[in-house]
Amino acid sequence: MRFKKHLLGWLAATLLFSSQTQAAPLVLATKSFTEQHILSAMTVQYLQKKGFQVQPQTNIAAVISRNAMVNKQIDITWEYTGTSLIIFNRIDKRMSPQETYDTVKRLDAKLGLVWLKPADMNNTYAFAMQRKRAESENITTISQMVAKIEQVRQNDPDHNWMLGLDLEFAGRSDGMKPLQQAYQMQLDRPQIRQMDPGLVYNAVRDGLVDAGLVYTTDGRVKGFDLKVLEDDKGFFPSYAVTPVVRKEVLEANPGLDDALNTLSGLLNNDVISTLNAQVDIEHRTPQQVAHQFLQDKGLL
């Protein structure tokens, strides 16, 4: 009888272990730019260290990722608060960073999506200039840039300012038209040069445009010594990156929330800008950058 009890106990433990090891991996979806590639590598390496199985899916567009998450095909993503507010929930009201987070957390909870701890960073849009030029012309805000554009328009129309923009920004609800309205910015069509987002940084650095639309945490801002202009009218929403997980996945994986919150707690604008630069300028891989960062933090 005692042998039979031991045998049953061993079989139960074996089945439990087998079910754990054969559990479906957590599906992690990230977008198609450097910052998201780094977040993907960081998440995979750290969660695997903590005993979770992870299946990364990269280069997934925001809307596709969102729909897949709602349909339970994706378990985890790193999303930006402003994207959920404006694109997914279609709210254009200007809010503080905390209001933005609280709003998307509340609304997305109705879909079974849990917003965890937001990183202390804001990868929002901004205009940037060559630092030396911005300092020499005493331009630190978008309003001052607009005033300079108008001054040149009035006094030297043959040398009107050129702005570099990515192709998507012109059509966004937080894009060029409402920006021009908010700042009373007058631009003729030839003054706007649309290009691939990555080319904007080079165009500003090389003087091909006078100012360009950038992402504030892009490593090339620091690497190319660009000056980010203050959004003094508070036009651009907050884009704090945050781990978002399906509620049932969190409930089925104890400790997952703590692990992801640990990662988000390490990130701020300076940190992520430095990591982005290591990939975009130093040409290291996202996996190498993530591994070194986690090692330096004592997490691997």
Curated annotation (Swiss-Prot):
Gene that this polypeptide is encoded by: osmX
Assembly and binders: The complex is composed of two ATP-binding proteins (OsmV), two transmembrane proteins (OsmW and OsmY) and a solute-binding protein (OsmX).
Pfam families xref list: OpuAC
Family of this protein: Belongs to the OsmX family.
Molecular function GO terms recorded: transmembrane transporter activity
InterPro entries: ABC_Gly_betaine_transp_sub-bd
CDD domains, per database record: PBP2_YehZ
Species per Swiss-Prot/TrEMBL record: Salmonella typhimurium (strain LT2 / SGSC1412 / ATCC 700720)
Phenotype upon gene inactivation: Deletion of the osmU operon eliminates the residual osmoprotection by glycine betaine in a mutant that is lacking the ProP and the ProU systems. OsmU deletion has no effect on the utilization of glycine betaine as an osmoprotectant when ProP or ProU are functional.
Function noted in UniProt: Part of the OsmU ABC transporter complex, which is involved in the uptake of osmoprotectants such as choline-O-sulfate and glycine betaine.
Compartments (UniProt record): Periplasm
Record keywords: Periplasm, Signal, Transport
Induction: Induced by osmotic stress. Part of the osmU operon, which consists of four genes (osmV, osmW, osmX and osmY).
Gene Ontology cellular-component terms listed: ATP-binding cassette (ABC) transporter complex; periplasmic space
Protein name: Osmoprotectant-binding protein OsmX
Annotated signal peptide: 1-23
Keyword Aminoacyl-tRNA synthetase set for record: no
